[in-house]
Amino acid sequence: MALMTPQEYIESLRKLNTRVYMFGEKIENWVDHPMIRPSINCVAMTYALAQDPQYAELMTVKSSLTGHTINRFTHLHQSTEDLMNKVKMQRLLGQKTASCFQRCVGMDAILSLIHIS
């Protein structure tokens, strides 16, 4: 499977059957809502940088499970080098977004489960 582009990520959100409420009101077009869209844009940046030849080496890695190129956020770390690249990737995204890019907690939770199970 090819790496997802930022546009494909955003379109995948539009296809979800999601009900979103904010401040007691239902939000029909939550993907484009001005309070939600900045977070979506930050996640989209994780896909954009993976597509950019300048950052692809840092943002992507060969999967130890499939052998396919995957986004580093979905990679199961195998070495200290993987962990160092994770930190470098997070620093780069912090510089590019000046915000939380929303994927760290999920990545850390999955990696914790891998190591204890």
Predicted regions and their residues:
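N-terminal-proximal low-complexity accessory segments that begin disordered
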Residues: 2-48
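Extended, charge-enriched "interface" segments that sit outside catalytic cores
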Residues: 32-35, 39-92
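Unusually extended, aromatic-enriched hydrophobic runs near protein termini
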Residues: 1-2, 62
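Short, flexible active-site-proximal loops enriched in glycine and acidic residues
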Residues: 85, 97-111
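Conserved small/polar residues in nucleotide/adenosyl-binding loops
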Residues: 114-117
